[in-house]
Amino acid sequence: MSDFAFFALEALIKCIIIIAIFASLAGLATYAERKVLAYFQRRIGPDMVGPFGLIQLVADMIKLFTKEDIIPSNSQKFIFAIAPLISAICAFVSLAAIPMLPEFTLFGRVIQPIVADINVALLFVIGTSGLCFYAVFLGGLASNNKWSILGAARGLVAIISYESVGALALIAIVMLVGSFSLVDINNYQSDGFFSWLIFKQPLAFVLFIIALFIETNRTPLCLTENDAEIVAGYGTEYSGLRWGMFFIGEYASMIAGAILVTLLFLGGFNGFWIIPGWIMMIVKSSFIFFWYFWARAAFPQLRPDQVMKMCYLILIPLAVVNLLITALAVLL
């Protein structure tokens, strides 16, 4: 087999594996979230369908796929129809440049668990994952429903504001490492526990986590939907499989965000002591992913004015100060 044919086959297999694994993980994440929230609320959670309620996932999938797909008569039908697809596609495309695990050898060839190892991977991931919100915005506007439009507008204001917070936090990381490559950022932290960037950039870590909650529409910083204020927000008019596509895209973005935090701040897939790198990657990413559930269970939903004041009066000034301190440290 020629090198090009092997490369093409390898890339195709990687794409199929990523889509299959992360679509499945999105379903498992819903089960995990329900169990975690039940524990916080002193309930049991799903436990009737299958052992430990695991088959509840299949039941939910059947229910979702067999629901009637309704398109409102006064909506912008084409945009309304494709918006959920944009959400899922952008979420999966952003995973293409994220290195998942350490490289390994298969059939005498070195395999890198990444679809495209590009030297501007960080820009690519942030850019494509940011496009996911266009699906939310377009879906809300195309629905021609006042709650959907309000949810889309609130989310647009938040995402524009908090993208600045996340970008300023990441610039500090790039200044230290000197590269936009996620592989280079991972390798920068390969000298042991205290080489992790969370110790050199603790403020950037906090700022990026907060921006990530806005990016993934998670409580307590989610402005696109609120049962007490705007019902389901942008998704009020969606049902069936189209709603499921939004759902899969959101959870895939959450998983990608957890992996990205691990790569940027927590040592990536570098091994620790006798623990292999791939185990460390899974454990650390799972821990970050758990924070989504913990925050939803522990904190109340913030009002839009509180979210925006926190951004412009606290977070952006802190991000700028952190950037200036990092620049001085690099120069000196």
Swiss-Prot record:
Main localization of the protein described in the UniProt heading: membrane
This protein's name: NADH-quinone oxidoreductase subunit H
GO BP annotation list: aerobic respiration
GO (cellular component) term, any one: plasma membrane
Membrane-spanning parts: 4-24, 44-64, 78-98, 120-140, 165-185, 194-214, 255-275, 279-299, 312-332
InterPro entries reported for this sequence: NADH_UbQ_OxRdtase_su1/FPO (IPR001694), NADH_UbQ_OxRdtase_su1_CS (IPR018086)
Family that this chain belongs to: Belongs to the complex I subunit 1 family.
Natural source organism: Campylobacter jejuni subsp. doylei (strain ATCC BAA-1458 / RM4099 / 269.97)
Enzyme class, spelled out: translocase
One term of GO molecular function: NADH dehydrogenase activity
Catalytic activities: a quinone + NADH + 5 H(+)(in) = a quinol + NAD(+) + 4 H(+)(out)
Quaternary data: NDH-1 is composed of 14 different subunits. Subunits NuoA, H, J, K, L, M, N constitute the membrane sector of the complex.
Pfam families: NADHdh (PF00146)
Record-listed E.C. numbers: 7.1.1.-
Function: NDH-1 shuttles electrons from NADH, via FMN and iron-sulfur (Fe-S) centers, to quinones in the respiratory chain. The immediate electron acceptor for the enzyme in this species is believed to be ubiquinone. Couples the redox reaction to proton translocation (for every two electrons transferred, four hydrogen ions are translocated across the cytoplasmic membrane), and thus conserves the redox energy in a proton gradient. This subunit may bind ubiquinone.
Compartments reported by the entry: Cell inner membrane
